[in-house]
Amino acid sequence: MTSVADRSTESTTTDPGAQLAADTVLRLRAVHRTGRTLPLEWRKRQLEGIIRLVTERESELAEALASDLGRTPHETWFGDIASTVGEAEYALKHLKKWMKPTRTGVPLALMPGKASYRYEPLGTVLVIGPWNYPFYLTLGPLIGAVAAGNCCVVKPSEHAPAASAVLARLIPEYLDSEAIAVLEGDAAITQQLIDQKMDLVFFTGGTEIGRKIAEACAPHLTPVVLELGGKSPVIVTKNADLGVAARRIAFGKLLNSGQTCVAPDYLLVEKSVREEFAAELKKAMSDMRAGAPEKQRVVNERQFQRLTGLLKGLKPETGGNADETSIAIEPTVVVNPDRTAPVMQGEIFGPILPIIDVDSLDHAIAIINEGEKPLAAYIFSKSKSEIERLFSEVPCGGAVANHIAMHVLAPQLPFGGVGYSGMGAYHGKWGYEAFSHRKATLKMPTKPDLKLMYPPYSERDQKILRKLA
Ligand code: NAD
């Protein structure tokens, strides 16, 4: 590990990666100190730049994701472009209001003081992106970072190399390159950047790496936002519209070959409707795959091996085929695998979907709450009370009734995990807040300047002060 001599003046190190990280952060810090990123106009220009980047260069983005992930242009538009534009437009619309200081009251003892709080940028921050939605999940956090007036280093995932190269090329073209930098590379450069004592690290990725990021940030007391994964469950009760449930679950699982952090990981289906539901699910999957190749490509050989490893020893209800040459796996449904099988342990993150029979909603909730708190939890039911039970009895990042993943697309809602699925939240105003410090300000008048406030305190002074407090 390399160290940097002084946070504000100079950097000396022998490792070229560490030198690049140190020089970049030093340069951005100097820019931040000039106040360049503070005005509303600068922030708005960056947000407009992000919108222009993804809309004007949509075809280049789509080509990159076809190469990295085997995605169709439509999936790129839906998953990475429309989602980014929605976030940026919302921030543009509300930013002026978010930046205004908010007046608050004061207790009697502080009257007639004037109290307020305002959002102050943290300084120079680091956004570490994953490979599964490489544009939305780097530009989305960047929207929060620039809206809040920060300088930012973006570190895209090396596992989506074409997308990483596009970001490195286009971000300087569309955004202020004095204040926003892209550094490509793997874990080493990430660690070297963290060693620069960033003012915040915003990480999206898996839980294990998230822990390493938090550990690396701890010695510097760098705050972290961790957007992690987990096993997001879906309950289907006997009161569900089974056709709608099957279509929406199939849609959520097939999107990006199941490599979506809020994809359905496993289903908990009431026994009395499981056969009928499984038939609907099979039909929905085959209808949605009409005209598409039998198997879905996954990101790389390592993920392919991990996923096919999960299939070993299971008896698929549908699917189960895989092709190593094209690193593609057929969407696969497995009914009632052993709960100790690997497929029911870690996050699946691929086109494999286990269904577990449950006796009741109580049973389903008990199973979910035995595990770590998931990033998302879903229920399909027409019963208001059943929906309310999921919302109130299952601790998780976010909960949705009768759909999959749609909460992600509402900038009016905070998005983030809890426990092993993450800490901190973003989207909309929460993104702006995540990259800001809430600074308290209190303006006191010089008069009156009551003697009773200062020692020595007479009996009478003490009585009055106790009444005022
Ligand atoms: P990952 O954890 O492998 O990597 C993410 C980033 O961390 C990459 O940029 C990588 O270079 C960097 N990295 C890897 N090892 C590192 C180390 N030792 N030190 C420092 N940096 C390191 O995640 P991934 O495989 O790209 O993404 C998949 C995971 O992300 C899944 O678990 C998924 O659920 C989760 N995810 C969460 C969200 C969310 O919003 N909560 C969104 C998408 C994906």
PLM regions with names:
Residues H32, R36, I51-V54, E58, ...:
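Structural signal for hydrophobic packing residues in well-ordered secondary-structure cores
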Residues P107-V244, V358:
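Rossmann-like NAD(P) dinucleotide-binding subdomain of oxidoreductase/dehydrogenase enzymes
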Residues A21, L40, E58, L242, ...:
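Residues at or immediately preceding the N-termini of alpha-helices
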Residues S11, D15, L175, E208-D338, ...:
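ALDH superfamily catalytic-core signature
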Residues T2-S3, R7-T9, L38-P39, I235, ...:
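Conserved C-terminal structural/oligomerization subdomain of aldehyde/semialdehyde dehydrogenase
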Residues M1-S116:
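N-terminal Rossmann-like NAD(P)+-binding subdomain of aldehyde/semialdehyde dehydrogenases
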Residues M99, E184, G205, T318-G320:
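Short loop/edge segments at beta-strand edges and connector loops
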Residues R43, A88, G149, I180, ...:
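Residue-level signal for inorganic ion chemistry
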